[in-house]
Protein backbone atom coordinates (compact mmCIF):
# COMPACT_ATOMS: atom_id res chain seq x y z
CA UNK A 1 0.00 0.00 0.00
CA UNK A 2 1.41 3.37 -0.98
CA UNK A 3 1.66 6.31 1.35
CA UNK A 4 -0.95 8.20 -0.67
CA UNK A 5 -3.38 5.30 -0.42
CA UNK A 6 -2.75 4.93 3.27
CA UNK A 7 -3.52 8.60 3.81
CA UNK A 8 -6.93 8.12 2.23
CA UNK A 9 -7.88 5.41 4.71
CA UNK A 10 -9.77 7.11 7.52
CA UNK A 11 -9.85 5.72 11.00
CA UNK A 12 -13.30 4.69 12.20
CA UNK A 13 -15.12 7.39 14.11
CA UNK A 14 -15.27 6.89 17.81
CA UNK A 15 -17.63 8.23 20.39
CA UNK A 16 -21.34 8.24 21.09
CA UNK A 17 -23.68 8.29 18.13
CA UNK A 18 -27.23 9.43 18.80
CA UNK A 19 -30.04 7.47 17.18
CA UNK A 20 -32.30 10.09 15.57
CA UNK A 21 -35.39 8.15 16.63
CA UNK A 22 -34.41 8.71 20.27
CA UNK A 23 -34.74 12.49 19.91
CA UNK A 24 -38.47 12.62 20.91
CA UNK A 25 -37.74 10.51 24.01
CA UNK A 26 -34.83 12.76 24.96
CA UNK A 27 -37.10 15.76 24.42
CA UNK A 28 -39.56 14.22 26.88
CA UNK A 29 -36.75 13.83 29.43
CA UNK A 30 -35.82 17.50 29.03
CA UNK A 31 -39.45 18.61 29.33
CA UNK A 32 -39.97 16.55 32.49
CA UNK A 33 -36.85 17.98 34.11
CA UNK A 34 -37.82 21.53 33.15
CA UNK A 35 -41.33 21.05 34.57
CA UNK A 36 -39.86 19.82 37.87
CA UNK A 37 -37.40 22.73 38.01
CA UNK A 38 -40.12 25.27 37.19
CA UNK A 39 -42.48 23.82 39.80
CA UNK A 40 -39.75 23.85 42.44
CA UNK A 41 -38.64 27.39 41.58
CA UNK A 42 -42.16 28.82 41.69
CA UNK A 43 -43.86 26.74 44.37
CA UNK A 44 -41.04 25.04 46.29
CA UNK A 45 -42.71 21.64 46.63
CA UNK A 46 -41.74 19.68 43.52
CA UNK A 47 -38.35 18.34 44.60
CA UNK A 48 -39.75 16.75 47.74
CA UNK A 49 -40.17 13.14 48.73
CA UNK A 50 -43.86 13.66 49.41
CA UNK A 51 -44.49 15.11 45.95
CA UNK A 52 -42.70 12.27 44.15
CA UNK A 53 -44.56 9.71 46.27
CA UNK A 54 -47.93 11.30 45.49
CA UNK A 55 -47.09 11.49 41.78
CA UNK A 56 -46.59 7.72 41.61
CA UNK A 57 -49.41 6.74 43.99
CA UNK A 58 -52.04 8.95 42.33
CA UNK A 59 -51.04 8.02 38.77
CA UNK A 60 -50.08 4.35 39.06
CA UNK A 61 -53.15 3.54 36.96
CA UNK A 62 -51.90 5.82 34.15
CA UNK A 63 -48.52 4.09 34.09
CA UNK A 64 -50.35 0.78 33.58
CA UNK A 65 -52.52 2.27 30.82
CA UNK A 66 -49.43 3.71 29.11
CA UNK A 67 -47.84 0.26 28.99
CA UNK A 68 -51.12 -1.18 27.70
CA UNK A 69 -51.38 1.43 24.93
CA UNK A 70 -47.75 0.96 23.88
CA UNK A 71 -48.48 -2.52 22.50
CA UNK A 72 -51.06 -1.64 19.82
CA UNK A 73 -49.36 1.64 18.87
CA UNK A 74 -46.10 -0.22 18.22
CA UNK A 75 -47.94 -2.11 15.46
CA UNK A 76 -49.43 1.06 14.01
CA UNK A 77 -52.76 0.37 15.72
CA UNK A 78 -54.55 1.85 18.72
CA UNK A 79 -56.87 0.77 21.53
CA UNK A 80 -59.56 3.36 22.17
CA UNK A 81 -61.45 1.11 24.58
CA UNK A 82 -59.09 1.22 27.57
CA UNK A 83 -60.94 4.04 29.35
CA UNK A 84 -64.33 2.39 28.85
CA UNK A 85 -62.95 -0.95 30.05
CA UNK A 86 -61.86 0.83 33.24
CA UNK A 87 -65.48 1.98 33.64
CA UNK A 88 -67.22 -1.35 33.01
CA UNK A 89 -64.82 -3.29 35.22
CA UNK A 90 -64.99 -0.69 38.01
CA UNK A 91 -68.79 -0.67 38.04
CA UNK A 92 -69.05 -4.46 37.96
CA UNK A 93 -66.32 -4.83 40.57
CA UNK A 94 -67.97 -2.41 43.00
CA UNK A 95 -71.36 -4.03 42.49
CA UNK A 96 -69.92 -7.46 43.27
CA UNK A 97 -67.96 -6.16 46.26
CA UNK A 98 -71.12 -4.65 47.72
CA UNK A 99 -72.90 -7.97 47.14
CA UNK A 100 -70.38 -9.66 49.40
CA UNK A 101 -68.27 -11.41 46.75
CA UNK A 102 -64.69 -12.00 48.00
CA UNK A 103 -62.21 -9.38 46.80
CA UNK A 104 -59.88 -11.89 45.13
CA UNK A 105 -62.75 -13.32 43.08
CA UNK A 106 -63.93 -9.81 42.17
CA UNK A 107 -60.46 -8.96 40.84
CA UNK A 108 -60.38 -12.14 38.75
CA UNK A 109 -63.79 -11.31 37.28
CA UNK A 110 -62.69 -7.75 36.48
CA UNK A 111 -59.60 -9.04 34.66
CA UNK A 112 -61.69 -11.59 32.75
CA UNK A 113 -64.12 -8.87 31.63
CA UNK A 114 -61.19 -6.87 30.29
CA UNK A 115 -59.85 -9.96 28.52
CA UNK A 116 -63.24 -10.58 26.86
CA UNK A 117 -63.27 -7.07 25.40
CA UNK A 118 -59.69 -7.51 24.21
CA UNK A 119 -60.59 -10.81 22.57
CA UNK A 120 -63.56 -9.15 20.88
CA UNK A 121 -61.36 -6.34 19.54
CA UNK A 122 -58.81 -8.83 18.27
CA UNK A 123 -61.54 -10.81 16.52
CA UNK A 124 -62.96 -7.71 14.83
CA UNK A 125 -59.50 -6.71 13.62
CA UNK A 126 -58.26 -10.10 12.44
CA UNK A 127 -61.40 -11.96 11.38
CA UNK A 128 -63.46 -9.06 10.02
CA UNK A 129 -60.54 -6.96 8.74
CA UNK A 130 -61.60 -3.88 10.72
CA UNK A 131 -59.13 -1.10 11.32
CA UNK A 132 -58.04 -1.04 15.00
CA UNK A 133 -59.48 2.48 15.33
CA UNK A 134 -62.97 1.31 14.30
CA UNK A 135 -62.81 -2.01 16.15
CA UNK A 136 -61.78 -0.50 19.48
CA UNK A 137 -64.14 2.44 19.00
CA UNK A 138 -66.93 -0.15 18.80
CA UNK A 139 -65.79 -1.95 21.95
CA UNK A 140 -65.40 1.43 23.68
CA UNK A 141 -69.05 2.33 23.09
CA UNK A 142 -70.13 -1.20 24.03
CA UNK A 143 -68.24 -1.15 27.33
CA UNK A 144 -69.33 2.39 28.19
CA UNK A 145 -72.96 1.59 27.38
CA UNK A 146 -72.96 -1.57 29.48
CA UNK A 147 -71.42 0.33 32.40
CA UNK A 148 -74.24 2.90 32.19
CA UNK A 149 -76.88 0.17 32.04
CA UNK A 150 -75.47 -1.55 35.12
CA UNK A 151 -75.36 1.65 37.19
CA UNK A 152 -75.28 5.41 36.84
CA UNK A 153 -74.82 5.94 40.58
CA UNK A 154 -71.57 6.64 42.37
CA UNK A 155 -70.59 3.32 43.94
CA UNK A 156 -68.30 2.91 46.94
CA UNK A 157 -66.60 -0.06 48.53
CA UNK A 158 -68.25 -1.47 51.66
CA UNK A 159 -66.59 -0.84 55.01
CA UNK A 160 -63.70 -3.15 55.77
CA UNK A 161 -63.35 -4.36 52.19
CA UNK A 162 -60.32 -6.43 51.23
CA UNK A 163 -59.41 -4.08 48.37
CA UNK A 164 -57.91 -1.63 50.86
CA UNK A 165 -54.59 -3.49 50.96
CA UNK A 166 -53.84 -2.07 47.49
CA UNK A 167 -54.15 1.52 48.69
CA UNK A 168 -52.51 1.18 52.11
CA UNK A 169 -49.51 3.52 52.19
CA UNK A 170 -46.14 2.06 53.15
CA UNK A 171 -43.53 4.55 54.38
CA UNK A 172 -39.92 4.05 53.29
CA UNK A 173 -38.55 7.27 54.77
CA UNK A 174 -40.49 8.86 57.65
CA UNK A 175 -39.54 12.50 57.22
CA UNK A 176 -40.22 14.78 60.22
CA UNK A 177 -41.57 17.43 57.85
CA UNK A 178 -45.32 17.25 57.20
CA UNK A 179 -46.33 15.51 53.95
CA UNK A 180 -42.73 14.86 52.98
CA UNK A 181 -42.46 11.10 53.53
CA UNK A 182 -41.10 8.79 50.85
CA UNK A 183 -43.87 6.23 50.54
CA UNK A 184 -45.67 3.94 48.13
CA UNK A 185 -48.54 1.47 48.08
CA UNK A 186 -49.30 -1.87 46.48
CA UNK A 187 -50.78 -0.04 43.49
CA UNK A 188 -47.34 1.44 42.73
CA UNK A 189 -45.76 -1.99 43.07
CA UNK A 190 -48.31 -3.41 40.62
CA UNK A 191 -47.54 -0.59 38.16
CA UNK A 192 -43.79 -1.24 38.41
CA UNK A 193 -44.34 -4.98 37.89
CA UNK A 194 -46.37 -4.15 34.76
CA UNK A 195 -43.51 -1.96 33.49
CA UNK A 196 -41.00 -4.78 34.00
CA UNK A 197 -43.40 -7.22 32.33
CA UNK A 198 -43.83 -4.88 29.37
CA UNK A 199 -40.09 -4.41 28.98
CA UNK A 200 -39.29 -8.12 29.12
CA UNK A 201 -42.26 -9.00 26.90
CA UNK A 202 -41.29 -6.56 24.14
CA UNK A 203 -37.52 -6.95 24.20
CA UNK A 204 -36.90 -10.54 25.27
CA UNK A 205 -39.66 -12.64 23.71
CA UNK A 206 -40.44 -13.75 20.19
CA UNK A 207 -43.89 -12.18 20.43
CA UNK A 208 -42.31 -8.85 21.34
CA UNK A 209 -40.02 -8.98 18.33
CA UNK A 210 -43.02 -9.86 16.16
CA UNK A 211 -44.84 -6.76 17.45
CA UNK A 212 -41.98 -4.55 16.25
CA UNK A 213 -41.90 -6.42 12.94
CA UNK A 214 -45.63 -5.84 12.39
CA UNK A 215 -45.12 -2.14 13.08
CA UNK A 216 -42.32 -2.04 10.53
CA UNK A 217 -44.32 -3.83 7.84
CA UNK A 218 -47.11 -6.33 8.42
CA UNK A 219 -46.76 -7.83 4.95
CA UNK A 220 -43.02 -8.36 5.45
CA UNK A 221 -43.68 -9.96 8.85
CA UNK A 222 -46.14 -12.36 7.22
CA UNK A 223 -43.66 -13.21 4.45
CA UNK A 224 -41.08 -14.00 7.12
CA UNK A 225 -43.50 -16.56 8.56
CA UNK A 226 -44.11 -14.68 11.80
CA UNK A 227 -47.38 -15.43 13.67
CA UNK A 228 -48.98 -12.06 12.88
CA UNK A 229 -52.62 -12.97 13.53
CA UNK A 230 -51.88 -14.66 16.85
CA UNK A 231 -49.72 -11.72 17.90
CA UNK A 232 -52.51 -9.25 17.13
CA UNK A 233 -54.86 -11.23 19.37
CA UNK A 234 -52.25 -11.21 22.13
CA UNK A 235 -51.76 -7.45 21.77
CA UNK A 236 -55.40 -6.47 22.23
CA UNK A 237 -56.04 -9.18 24.83
CA UNK A 238 -53.10 -7.90 26.87
CA UNK A 239 -53.99 -4.24 26.39
CA UNK A 240 -57.58 -4.73 27.58
CA UNK A 241 -56.55 -6.93 30.51
CA UNK A 242 -54.04 -4.31 31.65
CA UNK A 243 -56.82 -1.70 31.41
CA UNK A 244 -58.85 -3.86 33.80
CA UNK A 245 -55.82 -4.06 36.10
CA UNK A 246 -55.56 -0.26 35.99
CA UNK A 247 -59.22 -0.17 37.02
CA UNK A 248 -58.48 -2.36 40.04
CA UNK A 249 -55.60 -0.11 41.12
CA UNK A 250 -57.60 3.09 40.59
CA UNK A 251 -60.82 2.00 42.31
CA UNK A 252 -58.91 0.55 45.26
CA UNK A 253 -57.00 3.82 45.66
CA UNK A 254 -60.03 6.11 45.30
CA UNK A 255 -62.54 3.79 46.98
CA UNK A 256 -65.36 4.62 44.57
CA UNK A 257 -66.28 4.91 40.90
CA UNK A 258 -69.20 5.38 38.53
CA UNK A 259 -70.02 4.75 34.89
CA UNK A 260 -68.28 7.95 33.75
CA UNK A 261 -64.88 7.02 35.20
CA UNK A 262 -62.16 6.70 32.59
CA UNK A 263 -63.64 9.18 30.12
CA UNK A 264 -60.74 10.51 28.06
CA UNK A 265 -58.20 8.22 29.67
CA UNK A 266 -57.49 6.55 26.34
CA UNK A 267 -56.26 9.94 25.13
CA UNK A 268 -54.09 10.35 28.23
CA UNK A 269 -52.60 6.93 27.49
CA UNK A 270 -51.99 7.83 23.84
CA UNK A 271 -50.40 11.11 24.92
CA UNK A 272 -48.11 9.26 27.34
CA UNK A 273 -46.98 6.85 24.63
CA UNK A 274 -46.41 9.53 21.98
CA UNK A 275 -44.66 11.93 24.36
CA UNK A 276 -42.46 9.01 25.44
CA UNK A 277 -41.14 8.67 21.90
CA UNK A 278 -43.10 5.77 20.41
CA UNK A 279 -43.67 6.38 16.71
CA UNK A 280 -47.43 6.72 16.14
CA UNK A 281 -47.20 4.75 12.88
CA UNK A 282 -45.52 1.84 14.67
CA UNK A 283 -42.22 0.01 14.53
CA UNK A 284 -40.28 1.98 17.14
CA UNK A 285 -40.79 2.77 20.80
CA UNK A 286 -40.00 1.79 24.36
CA UNK A 287 -42.08 0.90 27.39
CA UNK A 288 -39.80 3.03 29.57
CA UNK A 289 -40.42 5.95 27.22
CA UNK A 290 -44.16 5.52 27.72
CA UNK A 291 -43.65 5.51 31.49
CA UNK A 292 -41.71 8.76 31.17
CA UNK A 293 -44.52 10.17 29.03
CA UNK A 294 -47.07 9.22 31.69
CA UNK A 295 -45.04 11.11 34.30
CA UNK A 296 -44.94 14.19 32.04
CA UNK A 297 -48.72 13.90 31.67
CA UNK A 298 -49.18 13.37 35.40
CA UNK A 299 -47.17 16.40 36.47
CA UNK A 300 -49.40 18.65 34.37
CA UNK A 301 -52.21 18.25 36.91
CA UNK A 302 -50.41 19.76 39.93
CA UNK A 303 -48.72 22.37 37.74
CA UNK A 304 -51.98 23.70 36.30
CA UNK A 305 -53.57 23.55 39.75
CA UNK A 306 -50.73 25.52 41.36
CA UNK A 307 -50.88 28.11 38.58
CA UNK A 308 -54.63 28.44 39.16
CA UNK A 309 -55.34 27.48 35.56
CA UNK A 310 -58.76 25.88 34.85
CA UNK A 311 -58.61 22.10 34.39
CA UNK A 312 -59.88 22.48 30.83
CA UNK A 313 -56.54 24.03 29.85
CA UNK A 314 -54.77 20.79 30.75
CA UNK A 315 -56.53 19.12 27.83
CA UNK A 316 -55.39 21.90 25.50
CA UNK A 317 -51.79 21.55 26.69
CA UNK A 318 -51.92 17.77 26.19
CA UNK A 319 -53.28 18.24 22.67
CA UNK A 320 -50.51 20.69 21.82
CA UNK A 321 -47.86 18.36 23.24
CA UNK A 322 -49.14 15.45 21.14
CA UNK A 323 -49.08 17.68 18.06
CA UNK A 324 -45.53 18.85 18.75
CA UNK A 325 -44.22 15.34 19.38
CA UNK A 326 -45.90 13.84 16.31
CA UNK A 327 -44.45 16.64 14.15
CA UNK A 328 -41.05 16.03 15.77
CA UNK A 329 -41.34 12.32 15.00
CA UNK A 330 -42.21 12.98 11.37
CA UNK A 331 -39.30 15.41 11.05
CA UNK A 332 -36.87 12.88 12.51
CA UNK A 333 -38.18 10.15 10.19
CA UNK A 334 -37.89 12.45 7.17
CA UNK A 335 -34.28 13.30 8.01
CA UNK A 336 -33.55 9.60 8.43
CA UNK A 337 -35.05 8.84 5.02
CA UNK A 338 -37.98 6.82 6.42
CA UNK A 339 -41.01 7.41 4.21
CA UNK A 340 -43.39 5.37 6.33
Curated annotation (Swiss-Prot):
Keywords: Cell membrane, Membrane, Sugar transport, Transmembrane, Transmembrane helix, Transport. Its main location: membrane. The keyword Transmembrane helix applies. The keyword Amino-acid biosynthesis does not apply. It is found in: Cell membrane. Signal peptide: none annotated. It is a multi-pass membrane protein. It comes from the Bacteria. The chain crosses the membrane at residues 23-43, 49-69, 73-93, 101-121, 130-150, 182-202, 234-254, 273-293, 307-327. One of its GO terms (cellular component) is plasma membrane. GO terms for molecular function: transmembrane transporter activity. The complex is composed of an ATP-binding protein (FruK), two transmembrane proteins (FruF and FruG) and a solute-binding protein (FruE). PANTHER family: ABC TRANSPORTER PERMEASE PROTEIN YPHD-RELATED-RELATED (PTHR32196), INNER MEMBRANE ABC TRANSPORTER PERMEASE PROTEIN YJFF (PTHR32196:SF63). Belongs to the binding-protein-dependent transport system permease family. Part of the high-affinity ABC transporter complex FruEKFG involved in fructose uptake. Can also transport ribose and xylose, with lower affinity. Probably responsible for the translocation of the substrate across the membrane. This is Fructose import permease protein FruG. It comes from Bifidobacterium longum (strain NCC 2705). The lineage of its organism: Bacteria, Bacillati, Actinomycetota, Actinomycetes, Bifidobacteriales. The gene is fruG.
